[in-house]
Amino acid sequence: MKLNELKAALAAHPDLNLRFLLPNGVAVPEHAHVTEVARIDKRFVDCGGKLRADALCRLQTWVADDLHHRLVAGKLLGILTKAAAILQSEDLEVDIEHEAGWISQFPVESVAAVNGELVFRLGVRHTACLAEDQCMRPPPGLKDFKLSTLEFKPIAK
């Protein structure tokens, strides 16, 4: 989800409490805080040697001991408005950083008003080759190769 889409959902429901649903369907405790809004810039070289750049907006959550805390959509919208100078774009993808045993980042797949809450459905990221045309591919015929056809010989010492 893009930042501009997220902000529109927040603006449309400013009084609703936020709820974050992890990809496994487990909800982040409702008293979670959004403790950080960041622009993450990544510059890297892919496996084919091509220089690449990527940027996203990351919202960090934190579950504190104050069980009565609730974050409403309007407050998060205000925080995002204050962060506009560092975000520099509303076209950034948004992800949520959350710690549940370890720190993980989840892309925001959708936001919808459900049963009086603004529910963020979080997804998962997968790795992929960014330069498939440059990667080594097996020669024709080798793709059907079976390891069981190999003859193993002991290595001489």
Question: PLM features: residue spans?
Answer:
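Small/polar-rich, solvent-exposed N-terminal microdomains that initiate assembly or binding
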Residues: 4-36
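Short connector loops at helix/strand junctions that flank enzyme active sites
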Residues: 29-31, 52-56, 89-91
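Mixed-charge, glycine-accented linear interaction segment located at domain edges/termini
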Residues: 122-157
